[in-house]
Each structure stands twice: as C-alpha cells, then as structure tokens.
Amino acid sequence: MPVKTPSPGDLEPIEKASQDELRALQLERLKWSVRHAYENVPHYRKAFDAKGVHPDDLKSLADLAKFPFTAKGDLRDNYPFGMFAVPREKVARVHASSGTTGKPTVVGYTLKDIDTWATVVARSIRASGGRAGDMVHIAYGYGLFTGGLGAHYGAEKLGCTVVPMSGGQTEKQIQLIQDFKPDIIMVTPSYMLTVLDEMERMGIDPHQTSLKVGIFGAEPWTQAMRAAMEARAGIDAVDIYGLSEVMGPGVANECIEAKDGPVIWEDHFYPEIIDPHTGEVLPDGSEGELVFTTLTKEAMPVIRYRTRDLTRLLPPTARSMRRMAKITGRSDDMLIIRGVNLFPTQVEELICKNPKLAPQYLLEVDKDGHMDTLTVKVEINPEANVGRHPEQKEALAKELQHDIKTFIGVSAKVHVCEPFAIERVTIGKAKRVVDRRPKE
C-alpha cells in the first residue's frame, strides 16, 4: 500500500540543518545538561568530583569523553528518586522498568519532558510515514512500561487518532483493526507476527486490512523479520528505538524513504560508541557499545549512559542526523523477552528468597512460532525438608512462576528439579542461560 513519503517541506528545520548548525546546538545543550546534572544531582556531583572534572571543562563535544559513565546500577543505587534533578513535586510522571522486589529502574519526567518525549515520538511516527489524521493502533503495553504511553502521547502530538489497545487479547486486536481501519500499528515485532498468524487462522487476509505501516520496537528484530512482515501484511515495517533510562521509545527511528537504520534524534540525545571493555570512544563506523547523554531532559538528565547495546554509528542519509545500525548483541547478560528486560540475577534473587530452592538454576530461551518463551529450571534445596511428590514440586514451581511474573513482568514456565539435576561447571563461570532463539 502507498505511504506518505516525507517531502523536504515536511521536515523540521533541525532535520535539514547543516552539520555545523547541529553540532553548535548539541554543544550548547550539552553544556546545559552537564551543569544541570552536576548542580542538582548529588550522584553526578560526587562522580564528577571523583574523576576530577567540572562542567567548565566541557568546551567541545569531544570533551564529553572526560566525564564518567552512568550505568543501570547507579540508577538502582539511588532508588527511587535520587537521580532526579528537580524537586519531586515538579515531577509530573514516573515510569519504572522491570526490577526485583526492591529495585526497579525509576525514571521521572517534568511536564516539559513529557512534551519533549511526545515531540520525538511524533517526529518518529512522521518519519515512518504517519500524518495528522491517521489512525494509530497501539498494542504496546500501557502502565509503568514506557512503550504504550510514549507511543500514545507522540501519536496525539502529531494529530493522529489513537486506539489505545495495549497488549494481549489477540482476537480483540484483530476485530478493532478490521472495524476501526487504522493506518498504522505500533507493537513489538514478535507480537505482530502472532497477530498475523491469528488473522490467517481466522481466514483473514492480512493484505486486505487498512494497515499501511508497522512501527516496531521494544525488542531486537532482524531484516529477515522485516521482510516476513512486509510480505505477509503488505505494510512498511519501520524500526523505532528507545530505552526508559534515556527517555523511552523515540530516541531514534527509521525513515520510511530509506529504512536504513534508525535516525538518532541528535538534537535531544547525544550518541557515542565506546569499546565496552576499555571505555575508549571509537570513531563512527566502528562496532561498540552505544552510549547516550540527554541534552534537554529536566527531571532526570543522564550523562554518558551505557546502554549495553552493541551497534555502529552510521552517516546521515535522509536526515541531517546520524543513524544506528541494527543491534548485534549486548555487552552484558541482559535478555529481552517479549519486550521485557530480564537479567539472570533477577531470577536468582527470587530463587534465593525461597529456602526450599537451591541457587542452582538454568534459563532456557526459545521461540514458539514468533514469540519468545522462557523456561526456568531450578533445583530443590537438598537441606530443606521438602517432599519429592509431584504436587509439592508443582506448588514450588507455581510460586516461583508467580514471583517472576509479578516482580519481573514476564511469564515463564518453571520446572523444579531434583538436587544436582542441573549440570555444574567446574572451570569458569556457571552457565545460567541457554538462548536457542535463531540468529540472523
């Protein structure tokens, strides 16, 4: 189906700016953000002082490399509001990513931040071919997860009609797509494939729907998956990138006319690529870990945040800003299961809270059709007074299954095993994860 390919008149001035204009704006905003963090966030004042740097030392964009990194652990160490740079009563909204019982990653937004977020998501939807008056079906989850509300406010900012469906209820999703006739769907790529499967099971030809564009994010997806979705649904499949700690969805987005990697909205987010082992800044085109510094966030500025995503920075094409290549992996052990970030250590903490279970476990990640599945195998504690009857194991499994869903936000199958059933590693690190999902 034809989509509305942007013309030069559709672009914001910053999307057409010269490199000199863009870099001058970035430096101005970077100086403000670094000083804002130093003067208002005790963590940053302490970290800058420990490294012997001061906001006055930032005289060029290259000088940012002198400043310390921020990691997810810093956010958790300052839970819940210790990273905020404004008084709590000035924070209009709080989101939180998945965490254990005590320490999710909390992010805050002022009203201006929410408007900025809506602006970059609106820009992302427009880059994907969306226009005012289009209907956008949002099947990202709503709530503490940033996906649903981030997409929602951006679509409204652009002037679109929003269908706030959220996730799940696949048959209902399809009914509304047929009845409301949306132009755009925003959803995880794996769930889109599930929707297409269900359409075909119901005898519905996906090519006959009103959908023209799918904006897919919250989990990595391959060019092969793009080709499959475009062929099966007759849509343009476009990649949106973001993370809660930096803003949410809308940090970067592909443009419909090129589909050659998400364009980073560099007027709000300054990217670097570093060697994940040494922290050295690498030249554009080199593969390494993606690092972001926010340039305009008021409530919670982040300086040199290590995303752990491995990618490359690519030169501009359809916009004046750089692009990022497809993410090839992560520099840590985080898994993304159906759009939810999960660390093996999170599961380990939940296991260790139950004295009837031993801290011997294995996470198995597979694909069931297009959906990620997680199976947790864990041993009974041999020192605990636990029976070996199947119903007792089943009760322990259900308890852990409930905890994983409640505190991490992902559904899992749990198998409780006899002591020593899980293979031990005698040399090197214990193998905690088996990821059988196909690689591109």
Curated annotation (Swiss-Prot):
Residue pairs linked by disulfide bridges in the UniProt entry: none
Reactions catalysed, as given in the entry: 2-phenylacetate + ATP + CoA = phenylacetyl-CoA + AMP + diphosphate
GO molecular function terms noted in the UniProt entry: ATP binding; phenylacetate-CoA ligase activity
Induction info: Induced by phenylacetate, phenylacetaldehyde, 3-hydroxyphenylacetate, phenylalanine, phenylbutyric acid, DL-phenyllactate, phenylpyruvate, or 4-phenylbutyrate.
pH profile: Optimum pH is between 8 and 8.5, with a dramatic drop of activity (55%) at pH 9. Less than 10% activity is observed a pH 6, and half the maximal activity is measured at pH 7.
Keywords noted in UniProt: ATP-binding, Ligase, Nucleotide-binding
Activity over temperature: Optimum temperature is 37 degrees Celsius. The enzyme is extremely labile, and the activity is totally lost within 48 h at 4 degrees Celsius.
GO biological process: phenylacetate catabolic process
Pathway of action: Aromatic compound metabolism; phenylacetate degradation
Pfam family, one: AMP-binding
Modulation of this protein's activity: Inhibition of activity is observed in the presence of a 1 mM of the divalent cations zinc, copper, and nickel.
EC code(s) of this entry: 6.2.1.30
Organism superkingdom: Bacteria
Quaternary state and interactors: Monomer.
Protein role: Catalyzes the activation of phenylacetic acid (PA) to phenylacetyl-CoA (PA-CoA). Involved in the phenylalanine metabolism.
Record PANTHER family: PHENYLACETATE-COENZYME A LIGASE (PTHR43439:SF1)
Protein name (record): Phenylacetate-coenzyme A ligase
Gene name of this polypeptide: paaK
